[in-house]
């Protein structure tokens, strides 16, 4: 009787472990799809935004606001010229050295940066998509994604088994 109990429990343990492993793999695939679905519209809408870099904020601000409103996961969009954040979809005209609020930016390469908000909802987690315009990387477009919404979308299908998500970006 004891041997039967041990064998039954062992088989049940292995079976449940396999189910949990499959659920984890399914969740990982779902998470990648969610992130792709969030980032793809940013990439598709970047060319009109790149053309705005260098334009006066009075001309670009309305376009930035409309673009940010059309992308549900975007918190804000900002234009950077010569390393200075000069126009934001939320604040309008600005004059802030980008390195002061985001030390990893500007960059000569397209970057995805996980950071914390230092302007609007201070301390809240954000995901920044940076698109440089110039070879020096000092000019570009910064799109700030609301990461709280991304994690909710990732946890959407199966909350009971997986209750928390850790997102690692970069190195």
Where are these regions (language model features)?
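Solvent-exposed, extracytoplasmic
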Residues: 60-71, 102-170
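Residue-identity detector for glycine
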Residues: 10, 45, 54, 83, ...
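A broad, low-specificity signal for short, low-complexity segments enriched in glycine/proline
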Residues: 7-10, 36-41, 89-105, 124-131
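Extracytoplasmic/periplasmic sensory segments of membrane signal-transduction proteins
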Residues: 38-99, 108
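Juxtamembrane extracytoplasmic/periplasmic/luminal helical "stalk" adjacent to the first N-terminal
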Residues: 2-55
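N-terminal short leaders/motifs
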Residues: 18-34, 81-84, 153-168
């Amino acid at each position: 009787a004891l041997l039967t109990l041990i064998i039954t429990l062992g088989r049940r343990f292995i079976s449940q472990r396999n189910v949990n492993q499959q659920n984890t793999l399914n969740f990982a695939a779902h998470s990648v799809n969610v992130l792709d679905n969030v980032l793809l519209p940013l990439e598709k809408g970047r060319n009109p935004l790149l053309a705005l870099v260098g334009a006066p904020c009075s001309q670009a601000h309305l376009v930035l606001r409309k673009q940010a409103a059309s992308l549900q996961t975007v918190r804000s969009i900002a234009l950077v010229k010569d390393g200075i954040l000069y126009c934001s979809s939320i604040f309008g005209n600005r004059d802030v050295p980008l390195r002061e609020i985001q030390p990893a930016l500007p960059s000569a390469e397209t970057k995805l940066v996980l950071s914390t908000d230092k302007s609007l909802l201070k301390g809240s987690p954000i995901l920044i998509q940076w698109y440089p315009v110039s070879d020096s990387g000092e000019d570009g477009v910064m799109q700030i994604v609301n990461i709280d919404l991304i994690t909710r979308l990732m946890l959407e299908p199966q909350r009971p088994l997986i209750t928390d998500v850790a997102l690692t970006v970069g190195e």
